[in-house]
Amino acid sequence: YQAAFDNKGMYTGEVSNNLFGVQHQYSKNGKDADKIGWLFDYGKKESVEKNLYQAIIKEGKGYEEVNDLRFQLILLTMLKQKAGNEAFTHLYREYRKLANQEGFDANKYPLPDLMNRYYGETSGYDFTPVLQKWKLYTDRIQAEINRSKGYKATASLADIVSESQLSNARKLVDKDILINSNFEMVDNQQIAPLGLKGSVKIQLNIDDINQLKGQDLLLKEGSKVVKRIAITGKELTVQDVPNGVYTIEIPTGREARYSVDKHYLYIKEKENHLTLKIERIQHSDLVNSSFQFLGLGDDPFAELRTNLNQQQAVFHITSKNPHTYYANKKYAGIQVFDENKKVIFDKEIEGTNVPTGQKDIPLKEAYTIKIFHAETGNRLKSDDSNLINTKSNENTFVVTKYGLENTSLKNNAEDDLLKKIDQAAERILANKEILESAVSEMKDQLWVAIQSLSNNNREIYLEKYQSIFK
């Protein structure tokens, strides 16, 4: 029952196995399991709930940051409960199919994305806002697929009802939910009878507001549009929005393609604020790469992601003890050089006692990245399967407009991009809702990627995928 997706994209080591225990206890004992089970510390539910609320809501911690197995189990229990047991079964069933494919690499299937896909397919709910609230990385493509299919956004009760109203909200919804918590997952209609409403000020951070002016920003519940907000400037104010979580749809720029950093709006019964970072797409997501650093037991301990559109890379260390056999010895490292070969980032990672955290690193065309891993052969992974020289502990990459080129493998970055374009196009063509949508970041990213190609390739690929852009 502990599948290979454990600890992929989120810590589940002593959490996922207990999901089965929770299901057994509550199916056998009903709500009395609060008093006899480990989930709420054998009857100390009030104290557990208070501490979890303090950590998540008041201190703003994410899933990993709470660093408490019980808290993490409660959150995953609430997610599973909203999706339903059939969705949990569907997740395992579909994962077995993936795992039996030739060349299967478990590191390419993080658990947050698996849950977002398979829980959504079964339940019709979009769990992207929940996972993002927990500060877990989620695949933008899967999130867009969820929205395109009209899945309803869902949220923890505590995220859409203020503390002073939680008691009333719990009285309303608890009777219909087996395992109760301030973090039980609900949709907007479940709390609508409370009659709670709030206002929101939306700030649009965009280089040219005229690209959007005169069009509408939409607030949606699944596929249903509940509010149309005329875009008159960079600051929008909306009154009397019922409490809940809403999917946001931003129109396409008139003359340029844009990406949006947030697609969900949370409303509580107060004045709410949301800033949307709307960036012109000059470099497609398809030119980006990610590297996963694995340690003892093949457990991930760090990740590097490039983002040429934002001219940066993000290096995230998630485990303080990558490999105990390498205590006081260099186990991994990253160096980044600018176009003049000046070192602008240098990080060495030993096997133990490593400070965790995230670092943003400047990154532009003509920069160089050097990655060291003492066990590159089987413990340095990439979403680009042919990008790593597994025979060398050090790999050097040059940043080009098409992506990364490994100086020892001599890969052609434009050829690599063509393959990514084909894969992205196939994914769009396989999703009728996205193919027919007038607003799609997947299509915008594909368009920009094709436009960046050399002249001959650009003409070939525009014709090849003209049906996507008609």
PLM features: what roles do these ranges have?
Residues 245-255, 263-265, 364-395:
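Short, aromatic- and glycine-rich surface loops/edge beta-strands on solvent-exposed regions
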Residues 234-240, 353-363:
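Exposed aromatic-hydrophobic patches
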